[in-house]
Amino acid sequence: GVQKTEVEATSTVPAQKLYAGLLLDIDDILPKAFPQAIKSSEIIEGDGGVGTVKLVTLGEASQFNTMKQRIDAIDKDALTYTYSIIGGDILLDIIESIVNHFTIVPTPDGGSIVKNTTIYNTIGDAVIPEENIKDATEKAGLIFKAVEAYLLAN
């Protein structure tokens, strides 16, 4: 089955800076901005571009231990970025993959809007409990706010 969420957030951080900080440089920034979120992220396949697979060890803010991420698409001109979670205990044994697609849109005031579509592809007709999706969306919001605060301060 497929379950989908769409979230938008506004920021005073300029679009290019937010794109770099939230997506391209997240492995460097997140441990500084929100150390409870991830302990480490290591590339296990690829060079950091499309097709790269990373093993992320999650921090104490998560009830899960690991997730394996694959970078599916990067478009620095359009400010879009897509990655999939393809492994780890975060998939609960009922999810095949979680696809995250981000678009950062510049706003006239020099800030930006982040649009995030998350597609949960479950195994067979498994259904992810609504509270799990709500929890994941809230955690993503906390990560966004932590990265935004870090970028505003640096």
Curated annotation (Swiss-Prot):
Principal cellular location given in the protein's record: cytoplasm
Gene3D superfamilies: 3.30.530.20
EC numbers for this chain: 3.1.-.-
Gene Ontology cellular-component annotations: cytoplasm; nucleus
Subcellular location: Cytoplasm
Pfam families: Bet_v_1
SUPFAM superfamilies on file: Bet v1-like
Keyword Nuclease part of the UniProt annotation: yes
Family, as annotated: Belongs to the BetVI family.
Function: Catalyzes the two-stage endonucleolytic cleavage to 3'-phosphomononucleotides and 3'-phosphooligonucleotides with 2',3'-cyclic phosphate intermediates.
Protein name, as recorded: Ribonuclease 1
